[in-house]
Amino acid sequence: MIYQGENLSVDYIEPGIAHLVFNAKGSVNKLNLATLQSVGEAIDALYSQKDLQGLLLSSDKSAFIVGADITEFLGLFDIPTEELSDWLHQANAIFNRLEDIPVPTLSAITGFALGGGCECVLATDFRLADETASIGLPETQLGIMPGWGGSVRLPRLIGADPAMEVITTGKPKRAKDALALGMIDGVVSRETLITDSVTMLKKAIGGQLDWQSRRTQKKAPLKLSPLEAAMSFNVAKGMIMKMAGKHYPAPMTAVKSIENSAFMDRDAALEVENKNFVALTQTDVAKSLVGIFLNDQLVKSKAKQAIKNSEPVTSAAVLGAGIMGGGIAYQSASKGVPVLMKDIAQQSLDLGMNEASKLLNKQLERGRLSGLKMAQVLSSITPSLNYASIENKDIVVEAVVENPKIKAAVLAEVENEVNEHAILASNTSTIPISLLAKSLKRPENFCGMHFFNPVHRMPLVEVIRGEKTSQQTIDRVVAYASQMGKTPIVVNDCPGFFVNRVLFPYFAGFSLLLRDGGDYQQIDKVMEKEFGWPMGPAYLLDVVGIDTAHHAQAVMAQGFPERMAKNGRDVIDAMFESDRYGQKNGSGFYAYSIDRKGKPKKNIDESTAGIIATVTNTTQPYTSEQISARMMIPMINEVIRCLDEGIIASPAEADMALVYGLGFPPFKGGVFRYLDAIGLTTYLDMAKEFEHLGAVYQVPESIKQKAADGECYYPAPQSLSAPSA
């Protein structure tokens, strides 16, 4: 044994050929701080081996290395920048020593080689992969860029243009695509990966493969003329500005880093990468995106626990077809859970089946599934005008019209048709679950299951716990949502649950801003371009449906009259009374036409101003800051109240629900990450300026107390000193 560490070992696999195996105790290998230190120690041990002729790197897991340990990131970002820079130098010294070892080196890649794992294999001379391999540098998706030589070695290996595409998109490449780009040197079967790798190393040792010129190429400047470089980098920067925009600086920083180091050797280029990596770690964007990743892991861990605690759903039913019912049925069937789709009208069943067929056809056209698979999915959706076979279903999702009396009647009826262990779930957006449960004999088997439209695109499902809902029911519905490929978040019952409860104060802020003379087009522009929402409030209302919003607004006002009851007619009333329902009838705040792809195209409607004029008697200019504050304060206050009341369990789950359910700007990380970033005292000062506007602008006492105590919503990152490498 040459070296034995906790996460890797090194021994001779054949005379002269050392084999470094990543073998962490957990289910996957991560290039965490401890593993990186072990790599350094192992390489030191290898340098002392007099008989060493070649080095093979591999993993004993189904994945090579899934990346760095992201749980360590926020602690590392908190290190003083000079210390972080020094540590990066030490870490890169390890990979440089791997690259410089005076024998040929080869990485045998199975499964994921991502982030630091990819940077590790880039430091070797050759890379052989099996067909399961997936290789990439996803750091820009976390608001940073490669920091262990990825932005230096990859362009020198495959060229600047393809390297910039890999780095700026952050999307990993499958084995065949990585081979086409030159990221790897061959694809072999999993069974022969190690033996084929040893054979390839022997060829390099014997001089049949020129490993030294490969190494020289990776350490030299890029082979670009000044004209080629100017064209390449200018085109890349233009595309990045269009795709990533100003709110996500990492892709542009990565491109500029590659550009500025293009004519440098490896060591000088690594200095440029170091400087840019450290700068990105200090941005709120990086902390927010890393925070989203960690929050997502928390939500998934809760779902995994629910899956362990429950039996899998093998058969389901949906009551109410149409677009929503068809979308739910498609999602269930496409993930392997057959579904009965029941409705009282054949026309609705046809609409639901057409919706499922349309979604499958799109996947077929894009090559994402075969015709056989499409037929199998469609055949696992059974449309029906009666309850035949529903007694065998594990779960029934009710998705009829958003009317409490109709929903209660349908639920009571179907409860008599199902077996006593079956779960009933209501896909309602605002109606309290405990209210609907009053019509049921077994309320413990009932909960809410709020899907977002369009079902196939929106990742979030709110699982709503009623007063009498059992934990067993919650666990099984969470497990079913996970089976469907969704991200379930459990919330406690109240009107609107979590997402819609916090959305309607946002709409109230919009109505008040228009009442006070704001311009809806300017508001949309500010909330989209400056704050970062995918849609401004006027456009969002058009997409949701102004008739839908008008109805939900009344439900929310009844549930929270002290804050959400209106003091008179507002812009939503005015649009509703004018039959301006939004995209669904072609006219809302904007007018809509159908483009060549069959999608609604937004156009300015000059008549909108006249409708808005009926609920305001003034026009007044507002700054971007005033608009953002007046729009966001009502939502933020309601989010805080939901946490205080236990509607949502944690800041992490609240932020994920906002990002996945409403499209809250990921670069801000969610409401609680945003509050921590700007500071609670800063927020209180901002809110105080607008408290005269009404109850939705009154901040909860809990945030005042947190600010007074100097606290944040998220715990401070675990303090790390720069690790020795």
Swiss-Prot record:
Record's Gene Ontology CC terms? fatty acid beta-oxidation multienzyme complex
The question of whether Oxidoreductase is a record keyword is answered with: yes
Site (Important for catalytic activity) residue list: 119, 139
EC assignment: the record states 4.2.1.17, 5.1.2.3, 5.3.3.8, 1.1.1.35
Gene Ontology MF terms in the entry: 3-hydroxybutyryl-CoA epimerase activity; delta(3)-delta(2)-enoyl-CoA isomerase activity; enoyl-CoA hydratase activity; long-chain-3-hydroxyacyl-CoA dehydrogenase activity; NAD+ binding
Which NCBIfam families does UniProt cross-reference here?
A: FadB, PRK11730.1
What's the family? Answer: In the N-terminal section; belongs to the enoyl-CoA hydratase/isomerase family. In the C-terminal section; belongs to the 3-hydroxyacyl-CoA dehydrogenase family.
Q: What is this protein called?
A: Fatty acid oxidation complex subunit alpha
